[in-house]
Amino acid sequence: DTSYIFRKLLPWMPRFLLTVGKINRMQLPVEEFLQAVVKNPSLRDIISQHFFRNTPTFFALSYFSLYLDYFYPRGGVGKLAEALRDKITELGGEIKTATLVTRVSPGSKTLSDDKNTSYAYGNLIWAADLKTLYRIAETEDLPAEVRTRYEAVRAKMLGNRGGESVFTLFLEVDEPLAHFGRIAHGHFFYTPSRQGLGETHRGELQALLRDFGGAGKEEVLRWLDRFIALNTFEVSIPGLKDRDMAPPGKTGMIVSFLAEYELFKKVEEAGWLDEFVAGVEQRVLKVLSDTVFPGLRDKLMDRFSFTPLSYHQRIASSEGAIVGWAFQKEMPVINKIQIADRSVLTPLPSVYQAGQWAYSPAGVPMSILTGKLAADRAIASVRKNR
């Protein structure tokens, strides 16, 4: 389409290259950037505390405008998965649920699951946890140079950790949508205190985790009091964007905030996870009821929550991460948009990677993009070998 190339693509290219240059110059952590431009520490906290630790500045500061432009499918985000399922089955594909892959053998191009079923493949696209892939891949029958490259990448993958996870509270409220529509929008961030978290979720939390065995339950709960009272909550009310998402006269609400997987893991090992989770829920409800949504607790019909452990258990995501890797100076995957096409490559023959672990920073758009890039590579391989 020469018209598209000359009228759209070529005029757009200089702006794209200029934007890429700006992005690459703003890779430093948002905390460092704000340190230089915002003198009030509480204000710095309120701006940055709902971002993952060391989030690149370009990603963090753009989010304030990007999330306002989000479009949601009618019926909820789950409709995306349903549409994908329907398309796969329409084209003759098969989806195996409740199945865990336990072995990948690139030499023989086979993989096995937890039911001891073996599958042969021509090309494999791994769209799940990358640490898992590098733990279960069997490389003994691969050439020595391939094994050497694989071991170097494997060490890098296993030496890094997933980013922070989230605690998500789901609420069923006996109150019409109009009541909440007078207070807020369908998706917003709310910080009840002007103080900011300070070191509550950084130094204080790390000190607590280092000496968790010596810290009593009461000390942990006192820390939790501060953590919830000073935090920032991401609140979603789907019914305000799609009225069919809630029964007449009722409202569904989703409240999320960043949470540390290791904390929940240590509480679980100490034997009081249910009590801790209930305590988190109660404190969140109290804060919201006392501030932005007066009387919310009195109108509550039901509730349930998802913890970092829940995400790990449901989808085998390392450290319960929801956006892939923790942000480090040396990332284990591609993190520059101009070479994003390389993000799907692995050292394993005929194995490609996609999803939130394949590129950093990640999210739904990059997960979709890496899926398309990996599919293109696999299709090209099939055509080449015909």
What residue spans do the PLM features occupy?
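Feature captures the FAD/FMN-dependent oxidoreductase FAD-binding
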Residues: 88-97, 102-110
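Mid-domain catalytic core of redox enzymes
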Residues: 102-107, 111-246
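A conserved FAD-binding loop/helix module that cradles the flavin
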Residues: 356-382
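A glycine-rich dinucleotide-binding beta-alpha-beta segment and adjacent secondary-structure elements
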Residues: 40-53, 230-236, 290, 294-360
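Active-site/ligand-binding neighborhood in enzyme catalytic cores
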Residues: 1-91, 98, 315-334
